[in-house]
């Protein structure tokens, strides 16, 4: 639900966004066309992963870093909706540079 609403609002504001973008991986002769799935890719530059869990496992930060690496991007955001104040659920994630809460 959160993803669909956020996607709708981004498009309404004029942003280009891809939803549920499938990412391929290749290993030797093996080609997996839909190995990973990105919740939202905004303007081809910003990966958004949306979650609604408490506590937020560290594996989700690794997941978004993997997506950033596969897309050759440096910046992403992890949004967790299972918080009292939304500002407490927003994390900037950097490819190979750690994570930082906003």
Role assignments for model-derived ranges:
Residues 1-16, 92-102:
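Solvent-exposed, charged helical/coil patches
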Residues 11-29:
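A short acidic/basic microdomain associated with nuclease active sites
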Residues 17, 38-56, 67:
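Conserved catalytic cores of phosphodiester-cleaving nucleases, focusing on short active-site segments
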Residues 27-31, 87-88:
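Short, solvent-exposed polar/charged micro-motifs at secondary-structure junctions
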Residues 51-102:
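Nucleic-acid nuclease catalytic cores
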């Amino acid at each position: 639900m959160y993803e669909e609403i956020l996607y709708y609002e981004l498009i309404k504001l004029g942003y280009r966004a891809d939803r549920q973008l499938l990412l391929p991986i290749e290993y030797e002769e093996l080609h997996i066309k839909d190995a990973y799935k990105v919740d939202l890719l905004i303007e081809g530059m910003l990966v958004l992963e949306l979650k609604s869990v408490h506590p937020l496992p560290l594996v989700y930060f690794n997941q978004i870093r993997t997506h950033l690496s596969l897309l050759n991007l440096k910046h992403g955001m992890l949004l967790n909706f299972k918080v009292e104040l939304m500002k407490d659920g927003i994390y900037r994630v950097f490819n190979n540079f750690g994570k930082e809460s906003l």
